[in-house]
Regions:
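Ordered alpha/beta subdomains of enzyme catalytic regions
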Residues: 1-217, 320-432
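Glycine-rich phosphate/ribose-binding loops and adjacent secondary-structure elements
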Residues: 199-355
Length: 432
């Protein structure tokens, strides 16, 4: 795999150069990832991307090609190139489990190390967590709106080809049942889905020929796209050719509520009571909710999912919260800029629960560990110790664990969190 080290901003390395020159580069520091606010009206966010970051961390190194580029462009000096040549991360990383809900100021990731090794991770880390968490947060709202009906990720053609793989992973973590993206299926063991598009029908001289070809190749349990020409004619034709075994039909246009109801009635009248109806066509969580009373069996979601459904970033930041002073002690530090202030000190985090196991507050502490308080659930887990990645957070296993964590975390939130009405974060963030 190619190195991930240049998936970063120019200033990370010029800052490193200046720190090496000043003698401060080896000071121990703690950086935290958090968001100051949720997107307007959102009640919670869902963390995703941690596993991807950890996978890429193993490849965050500077090989000959990268060093040659940095040297030829005079981006950094020889001393900095020498440091980068042997760069490996040797610190500690902890944070919220992937799939966990987060709120304003939740320390979703905490990086401990020297300033030099922690600062250069900023851009790479944030680019992953901001995108993946935006998709997961949207996917969580969509899957909640869908209830027991599965949502299927179909957004690859609306995203960068690599981002599409990440989006598929994040969507499945946040409750989606599968993806159309084969690379995501290969890399993360995700269930993949799909049958045919309008182009397949238009390729043939008639809809009959197209359906016959699809059924011969894929079997009667396939899903036929029935709105290329006339929906009624296509449904009747599909039933004629496949009989009661026809797996499903897909609707991709028009008034989906009315059309789904009509198609369900038609299928039932033809004896195909078990044939499923899938709807697509630029769905978001609100469109899915509007279809709750319609006889729909599953939803295919694309554009709105991979763009965060109106919130394409999670607005996460990476800030140093403590650093080693001249006496060798860790000293809290904080940014004081108006509107962008940070809170100094390395945080510990826990979620306060009531007697029913429902979350009532996000509790953060610097001098006190809130996980030691009564009726709280600890939120921080270790991912990397002394530069060594702990097992279970990457690859297929990482996705499985994150999917389970999302389901448990969402179930723990007050019922109002799963509604689409706008409001403040569903639980407050408290500092102790």
């Amino acid at each position: 795999m190619a190195t991930t080290s240049l998936l970063t901003d120019h200033y990370e390395l010029t800052m490193l150069q200046a720190a090496l020159a000043s003698g401060a580069a080896n000071r121990k520091c703690t950086f935290e990832v958090f968001t100051r606010r949720l997107p307007a009206g959102r009640r919670y966010g869902i963390l995703a991307g941690t596993g991807r970051f950890l996978e890429g961390l193993a490849d965050f190194r500077f090989n000959d090609e990268e060093l040659s580029f940095l040297s030829s462009r005079n981006i950094v000096n020889k001393e900095t190139l020498s440091y980068l040549e042997s760069f490996t991360f040797s610190g500690n990383i902890r944070g919220y489990a992937e799939g966990e809900a987060f709120f304003p100021h939740s320390p979703v990731l905490q990086v401990e190390g020297t300033f030099a090794e922690a600062c250069v991770l900023e851009t790479y880390l944030l680019s992953i967590l901001n995108f993946d968490s935006a998709v997961a947060s949207a996917a969580s709202r969509m899957s909640a709106a869908a209830g027991n009906r599965p949502c299927l990720e179909m957004g690859s053609r609306r995203a960068h080809e690599r981002a599409a793989v990440s989006a598929a992973r994040a969507a499945v973590i946040a409750g989606f049942a599968g993806t159309s993206n084969l690379e995501a299926g290969l890399r993360y063991g995700l269930h993949t889905i799909g049958t045919s598009a309008h182009a397949f029908t238009l390729l043939h001289d008639s809809e009959r020929e197209a359906f016959e070809a699809q059924l011969r190749s894929l079997g009667a349990r396939t899903t036929l796209l029935v709105d290329t020409y006339n929906v009624d004619d296509a449904v009747r034709l599909g039933v004629e050719l496949a009989g009661e075994e026809l797996g499903g039909v897909r609707l991709d246009s028009g008034d989906l509520v009315a059309t789904a109801a009509h198609v369900r009635e038609l299928l039932d009248s033809l004896g195909n009571t078990n044939t499923k109806i899938t709807v697509t066509s630029d769905l978001d969580e609100y469109a899915i909710a509007s279809l709750a009373a319609a006889p729909v069996d599953s939803y295919g979601v694309g554009t709105k999912l991979v763009t965060g459904s109106g919130a394409p970033t999670s607005s996460m930041v990476y800030k140093v919260v403590e650093r080693e002073n001249a006496a060798g002690e860790m000293q809290p530090v904080a940014k004081a800029s108006a509107g962008k202030a940070s809170i100094g000190g390395a945080k510990r985090a826990a979620r306060r629960l009531n007697g029913m196991g429902i979350a009532t507050a996000e509790v953060l502490g610097t001098h006190e560990d809130p996980s030691l308080l009564e009726d709280t659930r600890p939120l921080m887990v270790d991912f990397v110790r002394n530069g060594e990645l702990l097992p279970g957070f990457t690859g297929e296993e990482g996705v499985r664990r994150a999917t389970a964590r999302h389901a448990a975390s969402l179930a723990e939130l007050p019922e109002a969190a799963r509604r689409l009405s706008e409001g403040e974060p569903i639980i407050p963030t408290e500092f102790i």
